[in-house]
Amino acid sequence: MFPMVTEFMNYGQQTVRATRYIGQGFMITLSHANRLPVTIQYPYEKLITSERFRGRIHFEFDKCIACEVCVRVCPIDLPVVDWKLETDIRKKRLLNYSIDFGICIFCGNCVEYCPTNCLSMTEEYELSTYDRHELNYNQIALGRLPMSIIDDYTIRTILNLPEIKT
């Protein structure tokens, strides 16, 4: 008789515990019910990136001294720097600079350690293409400034969405 009573008490305790856990989960679900949705309609609405967002790298050809610090600090030795030594002035002259964004991990080491600040991170993150060879950017493609999301009048950002009346 006593084992049957203890089994019944254990069953009751387990039922109460399970009901409490289900109730806690339901309360969390209900707490999210009155919040605004986070989902955006991507091609037409975009989130504004933070100041420290690590997007596509912008390169300024005139500032580069071809020191190759960016290549040495890159964990995958990605930037390709072609230069020629000018013997009359004893300086390097930059011929070509390219980065393959299909391989780049956007760590930002090249930007951080560049002594002349010729590299900077932009807020551009739309780098998708149908051919991965198009992701190999040379100094001309790297030098183009991206259109700012805030300044683009065709795109609605979260800041300029119409107010939702409740």
Curated annotation (Swiss-Prot):
Gene3D superfamilies: 3.30.70.3270. It catalyses: a plastoquinone + NADH + (n+1) H(+)(in) = a plastoquinol + NAD(+) + n H(+)(out); a plastoquinone + NADPH + (n+1) H(+)(in) = a plastoquinol + NADP(+) + n H(+)(out). PROSITE patterns: 4FE4S_FER_1, 4FE4S_FER_2. Residues 55-84, 95-124 form the 4Fe-4S ferredoxin-type domain. Disulfide bonds: none annotated. Its cofactor is [4Fe-4S] cluster. It holds the Pfam family Fer4. GO terms for biological process: photosynthesis, light reaction. The keyword Iron applies. It comes from the Eukaryota. Its EC number is 7.1.1.-. Keywords: 4Fe-4S, Chloroplast, Iron, Iron-sulfur, Membrane, Metal-binding, NAD, NADP, Plastid, Plastoquinone, Quinone, Repeat, Thylakoid, Translocase. Belongs to the complex I 23 kDa subunit family. NDH shuttles electrons from NAD(P)H:plastoquinone, via FMN and iron-sulfur (Fe-S) centers, to quinones in the photosynthetic chain and possibly in a chloroplast respiratory chain. The immediate electron acceptor for the enzyme in this species is believed to be plastoquinone. Couples the redox reaction to proton translocation, and thus conserves the redox energy in a proton gradient. This is NAD(P)H-quinone oxidoreductase subunit I, chloroplastic. The lineage of its organism: Eukaryota, Viridiplantae, Streptophyta, Embryophyta, Tracheophyta.
